[in-house]
UniProtKB/Swiss-Prot annotation:
Substrates-to-products reaction catalysed: L-glutaminyl-[protein] + L-lysyl-[protein] = [protein]-L-lysyl-N(6)-5-L-glutamyl-[protein] + NH4(+)
SUPFAM superfamilies assigned: Cysteine proteinases, E set domains, Transglutaminase, two C-terminal domains
Active site residues of this protein: 400, 427
Protein name per Swiss-Prot or TrEMBL: Annulin
Gene3D superfamilies referenced in this protein's UniProt entry, alphabetically: Immunoglobulins, Transglutaminase-like
Keywords, ordered alphabetically: Acyltransferase, Calcium, Cell membrane, Lipoprotein, Membrane, Metal-binding, Palmitate, Transferase
Tissues of expression: Has an annular, or ring-like expression pattern in epithelial annuli of developing limb segment boundary cells. In embryos, it is seen in gastrulating cells, in cells surrounding rapidly dividing neuroblasts, and in muscle pioneer cells invaginating to form apodemes.
Pfam families: Transglut_C, Transglut_core, Transglut_N
Biased composition (Pro residues): 38-53
Species of the source: Schistocerca americana (American grasshopper)
Cofactor(s) demanded: Ca(2+)
Reported function: Participates in morphogenetic activities of the cells, maybe by stabilizing the membrane or subcortical structures of cells that are under mechanical stress. Probably catalyzes the cross-linking of proteins and the conjugation of polyamines to proteins.
EC number(s) recorded for this UniProt protein: 2.3.2.13
Length: 772
């Protein structure tokens, strides 16, 4: 029979029942793993195509129209699918096609002769590259017959002939809206109807991503501005600092850069262990990557470190974005040292956006770490006003950062009138085990707000982070009973923040996680959560306070590092008849942002008589010389006051967070940025310290900068003086762009700045050589 079989085993009939009536069997030539496929004929025996206009002799059987060339139309598909910025699509050597599921992409197929729909049948065979045993049932193997325009079937996948000109076909292929996300291989089988077939294997794999523009996709998000922000924006802001001094820090997500998409898929499949057949499910994928981004269980992307000793790695505060972290991990396949919560969240957001998942980074201030699922955070205080770290298993972080991912939750039935689709909290910081792995989420944010803490996954933990009550107990010794000295129902879960859509400003999303404090709805949600968590705690500890003496902190909240600051406790006697003697212990400690006290800076113990109706104050003045040797990463302090009112059984304890502010790097462009043209810029920093800054270094990332620029200063920066560095970059694309800068030195670290600007399109050149 030669190289083209005259028989065709019709095992799979993709268009049976759709009116086509053409039984097609997906086959493949070359080194296929399917033994029943048909071999591709050697080039020497393929008949020459007829000349244009030739009419085959009625007595001569036409040859199979074999595929000669396939063009995946990178530029056209990149624009249509909003994937043109992926380095895979844009690189000079061996570019790859990246498309989104549920949306047609175009290919141009050149045949060995003109296509005749009366005698020719064409079928596309798509296979998930990582599938060990591709199968139709698991969706890792798909056969799609070519149909005429207007004859689209109701099948999940479709291939439609858009147009034809002689031997060139333009075909629109639509992957299913729930297609597996990952790398796919494409084969094209051609045959004569009722005769044998030959197969063509396209040389390169292509990528299918989630498609939040597709209404049938589980991650569909309506609103172009939202999609531009949460899928396509490669730069964002992550909030750090404290609830009373919010600090926005620029973060380069870099989801389109070299190796980022491949690394994201590696984290899903190899580290996260998601089977190919499950890679279309965003719930399964997000839960897996929340563990894969951290390292304790599976040697994932980032190793956490909260010790303040970062030997052998990069301090978390020195990262400017996700690109270098993920590229280093993908190259070495070892966890990158080191990260803390905002690094884990920034990397997770990058991975999600690279895969096509709408994602945003979210910060909660005064976030509870409730290890006992009690919905309270209990602190024990000794007679010196110190928090007893050895007795505290819970903690309150100055801030905590996680990621929200947008998706429907078909795995959850609606309950109590709530629909659980929308934003889902996903946390990759390794804090607590969930199903025996360090991961958290996806937890429906609406379930958190309603107190539905049993809704998967980890809603109870997220609820406690933003709703737990803070309780302080006075510890007087192992034989003495604990004494309740303060409770705080309002301090946890403040100023929940994310970057605003289309603006480099803060959007407060606290109301998406919780009802207003002390509202009827908020208390109802808390009581529901307490019942569902079977907590032993109740509200019986909410006793009446002693109200004759009112205590209040007065603290300036805009102190630049290098400057002195003062802490004042004001005590007002509200009684018109009774004098009171009060002993006040006031202390200032440096604290890690996780809430753990590091070093004592200064303390004062005084006794004051406060006459009826009078006001007294206790003050501590703290100089730079007092605190600079004790500073830790976030320049955060814990201010604590323990006051004992004599002749009563009342003790007052309060604490507050405070941080000194770092200066900002100023960035200035020299000229108007134009696509494809080299630009110059200047980054400037002023030294706010009373001492010189030595061996300073700038890190720069921006449009067209493939590798982070490191610029070392050759001279010290004297107190009050400025240092500037020049750098160049060439924007590859027009539109909005951002330059991000970091500065570090021994004396002054974790300083950043950014500049957001517009890049003009490349100017067209007319025939005279002038710009049109």
């Amino acid at each position: 029979m030669g190289n083209c079989c005259s028989t065709f085993r019709a095992v799979f009939k993709p268009n049976e029942g759709s009116g086509g009536g053409i039984p097609l069997m997906p086959v493949r030539g070359g080194s296929t793993r399917r033994p029943d496929s048909l071999p591709k004929p050697p080039a020497a025996v393929v008949p020459s195509p007829p000349s244009p206009g030739d009419v085959p002799d009625a007595g001569v059987a036409p040859e199979v129209a074999s595929v000669k060339e396939v063009d995946v139309l990178l530029a056209e598909n990149g624009d249509a699918h909003r994937t043109r910025h992926y380095e895979l699509m844009d690189r000079e050597k061996e570019p790859r096609l990246v498309v989104r599921r549920g949306q047609p992409f175009a290919v141009s197929v050149t045949l060995s002769r003109p296509y005749n729909p009366d005698i020719d049948a064409i079928s596309f065979v798509f296979t998930v590259e990582d599938a060990e045993k591709p199968s139709y049932g698991q969706g890792t193997l798909v056969a799609v017959p070519l149909l005429a325009k207007g004859a689209e079937s109701g099948a999940a996948w479709n291939a439609v002939l858009d147009s034809s000109a002689d031997d060139i076909l333009r075909i629109q292929i639509t992957p299913a809206a729930d297609a597996i996300v990952g790398k796919w291989k494409m084969d094209i089988d051609t045959k004569l109807k009722n005769d044998g077939a030959v197969s063509y294997s396209y040389k390169d794999p292509f990528y299918i991503l989630y498609n939040p523009w597709c209404r049938q996709d589980q991650v569909f998000l309506e609103g172009e501005e939202l999609l531009q922000e949460y899928v396509l924006n490669d730069t964002g802001l992550i909030w750090r600092g404290s609830y009373n001094r919010l600090r926005p820090c620029v973060w380069k997500y870099a989801q389109f850069e070299k190796e980022i998409l491949d690394c994201a898929l590696y984290l899903v499949s190899k580290i996260g262990g998601v089977r190919p057949s499950e890679c279309g499910d965003p719930v399964r994928v997000c839960r897996a990557i929340s563990a894969a981004v951290n390292s304790p269980d599976d040697n994932g992307a980032v190793m956490g470190n909260w010790s303040n000793d970062y030997g052998g790695g990069t301090p978390p505060t020195k990262w400017i974005g996700s690109m270098k972290i993920l590229q280093q991990f993908y190259k070495n396949k070892k966890p990158v040292k080191y990260g803390q919560c905002w690094v884990f969240a920034g990397v997770l957001t990058t991975v999600c956006r690279a895969l096509g998942l709408p994602a945003r980074t979210v910060t909660t201030y005064s976030a509870a770490h409730d290890t006992q699922n009690s919905l309270t955070v209990d602190y024990f205080v000794d007679d010196k006003g110190e928090i007893m770290e050895e007795m505290n298993s819970d903690s309150i972080w100055n801030f905590h950062v996680w990621t929200e991912v947008w998706m429907e939750r078909p795995d959850l039935m609606p309950g109590d009138g709530a629909h659980y689709g929308g934003w889902q909290a996903v946390d990759s910081t390794p804090q607590e085990l969930s199903d025996n792995m360090y991961r958290c989420g996806p937890a429906p944010v609406v379930a958190v707000k309603q107190g539905e803490v049993l809704r998967p996954y980890d809603s109870a933990y997220v609820f406690a982070e933003v709703n737990a009550d803070k309780v302080f107990w006075r510890y007087s010794g192992p034989t003495q009973p604990l004494k309740l000295i303060r409770k705080d129902m309002l301090g946890i879960g403040q100023n929940i923040s994310t970057k605003a859509v289309g603006r480099f400003q803060r959007e407060d999303i606290t109301n998406t996680y919780k009802y207003p404090e002390k509202s009827v709805e908020e208390r109802a949600a808390m009581l529901k959560a307490l019942r569902q968590s079977e907590s032993l705690f109740s509200r019986y500890y909410l006793n009446e306070d002693f109200n004759d003496i009112h205590f209040n902190f007065e603290l300036r909240d805009d102190i630049v590092i290098g400057s002195p600051f003062s802490v004042v406790v004001v005590m007002k006697n509200r009684s018109n008849q009774q004098d009171y003697t009060v002993t006040v212990l006031l202390r200032v400690d440096t604290v890690l942002y996780t809430g753990h006290v590091k070093d004592g800076v200064k303390k004062e113990k005084v006794e004051r008589l406060i006459k009826a109706g009078a006001v007294e104050e206790v003050r501590i003045d703290v100089s730079y010389e007092d605190y600079y040797k004790h500073l830790v990463d976030q320049c955060a302090f814990n201010i604590a006051c323990l006051a004992t009112v004599h002749d009563t059984n009342y003790e007052y304890f309060a604490q507050d967070d405070f941080r000194v502010r770092k200066p900002d790097i100023k960035i200035k462009l020299e000229g108007e940025p134009v696509q494809g043209q080299e630009m110059s810029a200047v980054a400037t920093l002023k030294n706010p310290l009373p001492i010189p800054v030595k061996k300073g270094q700038f890190l720069i990332e921006g449009p067209g900068i493939a590798k982070t620029q490191k610029i070392k200063l050759s001279q010290n920066i004297a107190p009050g003086e400025e240092a500037s560095v020049n750098f160049k970059f060439t924007p590859k694309y027009d539109g909005r762009a951002t330059i991000a800068a970091k500065f570090s030195s021994k004396e002054l670290d974790d300083v950043d700045g950014f500049l957001n600007f517009m890049v003009e399109p490349k100017k067209e050149v007319n025939g005279t050589g002038n710009a049109a």
